[in-house]
Structures are given as C-alpha cells and as structure tokens.
C-alpha cells in the first residue's frame, strides 16, 4: 500500500471510531436524561441530534444548531482538534455529547 492509501485507510478508521464514541457517550448521557440522541453517520458527515439541538461534523468542521461553527480534525495519533484545542478522542466525544444533551 502507498503512503496515501495508508493515510486514507487510517482516516476512515478514525472517522468510524469518532462516530462510535459519539454514539456510546450519547447513550451514556441519555441514561441520566429525559431525552435520547440520534446519530446519523455517513462517509462525509456525522450528525448527532438530541431534542431540538444538533451538532454536525464534516471532515473539516463542526457546526451546531445555534449557528456556531468551528474547525474540526481527526489526527493520525488518535486525537481530535476541535475549536483550536487538541484533546483525546474519547474526552472530546464525551464533552460534545454532554454539552448537547444538557
């Protein structure tokens, strides 16, 4: 495999992992809430909805239902860069879903 195809394959796996973490943390946050989240997952975007709130991820951006946007990136080391801050993928997914479901 060429370096480009390895990077593309790694990014696909990171994208799937990000969606899975969002789903898991949304379910966990839903245990202590009167609402639940719905995750829409595709190759180009992931949307998490909880009640009237939503957050949408593309490969380069996070957009919220309130109109806010922020840069977003999945890094090869398994971290996430969101709004200029780098964090472990699981911590970022927990924070995103917790904020969405409050």
Question: Which positions does each model-derived feature cover?
Answer:
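Amphipathic, interaction-prone secondary-structure segments
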Residues: 24, 29-66
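Generic detection of intrinsically disordered/low-complexity segments and helix-coil linkers/edges
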Residues: 9-12, 19, 48-51, 66, ...
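Contiguous, amphipathic alpha-helical segments that mediate oligomerization or scaffolding
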Residues: 1-37
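Detector for methionine-enriched segments
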Residues: 1, 86-89, 101
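Extended, compositionally biased alpha-helical segments that mediate assembly or anchoring
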Residues: 92-102
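Intrinsically disordered, low-complexity regulatory segments enriched in Ser/Thr/Pro
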Residues: 52-91
């Amino acid at each position: 495999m060429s370096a480009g195809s390895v990077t593309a394959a790694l990014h696909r796996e990171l994208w799937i992992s990000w969606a899975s973490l969002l789903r898991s943390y949304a379910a966990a946050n839903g245990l202590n809430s009167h609402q639940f989240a719905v995750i829409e997952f595709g190759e180009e975007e992931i949307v998490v909805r909880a009640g009237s709130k939503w957050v949408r991820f593309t490969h380069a951006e996070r957009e919220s239902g309130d109109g806010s946007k922020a840069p977003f990136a999945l890094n090869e080391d398994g971290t996430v860069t969101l709004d200029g801050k780098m964090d472990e993928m699981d911590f970022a997914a927990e924070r995103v879903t917790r904020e969405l479901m409050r």
